[in-house]
Amino acid sequence: MSEEKQQEVLKFFSTVREEYENRIGFKMRTQSRLRVQVEARVAIINAIRPYGTLMNIAKVMDKKDHSTIVHSLKSHETHFAFSPNYRAKYKIALETVRDTAVANGVDPH
């Protein structure tokens, strides 16, 4: 991926994160283990996955490397199956990504 394309992806991800935080009503703290924070992070990570690499997502989520992102992707099904709050956050995350992508003319492929 070219440097220019990478910068576009990171800008898009940052815009999505800001809009998502506005919609859910709080800032995501990257070090917090509170369930509400974890579910919010996992939801947005899974929603933006089709739009970039694991490293791009890690950068925008203030993580050191992609391993946390891989863990979040793997935990999606469990959260989705057992947490109504997570399902609501994931729906908001998907809508945020879709709306932001349409507004900015971004295609996931």
What is the predicted function of each stretch?
Residues 65-69:
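Helix-turn-helix DNA-binding helix
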Residues 5, 34-38:
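Residue-level marker of regulatory loop/turn positions in helix-turn-helix DNA-binding domains and
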Residues 80-103:
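Short Lys/Arg-enriched helix C-cap and helix-to-coil transition segments
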Residues 37-52:
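Short, amphipathic alpha-helical "recognition" segments used to contact nucleic acids or chromatin
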Residues 19-34:
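Short, Lys/Arg-enriched N-terminal segment that forms or immediately precedes the first helix
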Residues 1-15, 96-99, 106-109:
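General nucleic-acid-binding
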Residues 56-61:
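Short alpha-helical "recognition helix" segments of helix-turn-helix
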Residues 49, 72-73, 80:
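DNA major-groove recognition helix of helix-turn-helix
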